[in-house]
């Protein structure tokens, strides 16, 4: 019997430590395989090969590629909500807060860009992915709009619509992160380090929202 299958002797085994580790290995392998082949071309065999697992093990946890991507996208959303969408603390400088949240977003996107790219592409043709992607964006826009309103209370971004500004800025951030990490971006032969990326984006965003660097 396959080594992965032999670990599963009852319905509760997938929730075990071994089952959780196998599930996580498949998700990590999926990110690697999608980064190389793209979601539309990647095969289950590519994913399990990258994960060091058997195709049979894959189907113990996921019905197919779409189900796997939905779970990866849910993980991506959880990271964003926890690390990026947190509101400023009372008395926290808005510029510092924005810079810290941007640094977190860049780090998450750098690690999970295959998921974000795949989900965005699927949202063009699949209604479930379209709704999921829209929900993630709306949460991000609302969180950013709240920071814009706080900045406006301190004299920044005077007269601008907070939600439209938040939508414009988050769209710019998302595409810049995609463009700087994707193989087909503006700099395919260049590794853009964290500090350089965050410094450039922080300058642009803080100018737009607070009028200062």
Spell out what each predicted region is.
Residues 21, 25, 33-67, 71:
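Helix-turn-helix
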Residues 71, 85-114, 162-169, 198:
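Hydrophobic alpha-helical connector segments
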Residues 111-143, 163-164, 191:
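Short secondary-structure transition hinges
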Residues 130, 152-202, 212-213:
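Hydrophobic/aromatic-rich alpha-helical bundle segments in the mid-to-C-terminal region
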Residues 27, 99, 103, 138-149, ...:
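An amphipathic alpha-helix signature
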Residues 22, 26-34, 76, 80, ...:
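Short hydrophobic clusters on alpha-helical segments that form packing/core surfaces
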């Amino acid at each position: 019997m396959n080594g992965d299958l032999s670990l599963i002797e009852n319905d509760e085994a997938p929730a075990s430590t071994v089952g959780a580790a196998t599930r996580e290995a498949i998700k990590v392998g999926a990110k690697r395989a999608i980064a190389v082949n793209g979601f539309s071309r990647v095969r289950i065999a590519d994913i399990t090969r990258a994960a060091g697992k058997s195709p049979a093990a894959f189907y113990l946890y996921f019905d197919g590629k779409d189900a796997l991507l939905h779970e990866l996208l849910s993980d991506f959303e959880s990271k964003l909500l926890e690390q990026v969408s947190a509101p400023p603390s009372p008395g926290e400088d808005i510029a510092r807060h924005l810079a810290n949240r941007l640094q977190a977003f860049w780090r998450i996107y750098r690690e999970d860009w295959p998921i974000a790219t795949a989900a965005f592409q699927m949202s063009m043709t699949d209604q479930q992915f379209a709704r999921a992607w829209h929900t993630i964006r709306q949460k991000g826009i609302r969180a950013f709009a709240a920071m814009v309103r706080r900045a406006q209370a301190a004299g920044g971004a005077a007269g601008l619509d907070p939600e439209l500004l938040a939508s414009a800025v988050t769209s710019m951030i998302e595409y810049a992160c995609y463009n700087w990490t994707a193989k087909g971006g503006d700099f395919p032969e260049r590794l853009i380090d964290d500090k350089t990326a965050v410094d450039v984006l922080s300058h642009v965003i803080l100018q737009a929202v607070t009028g200062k660097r």
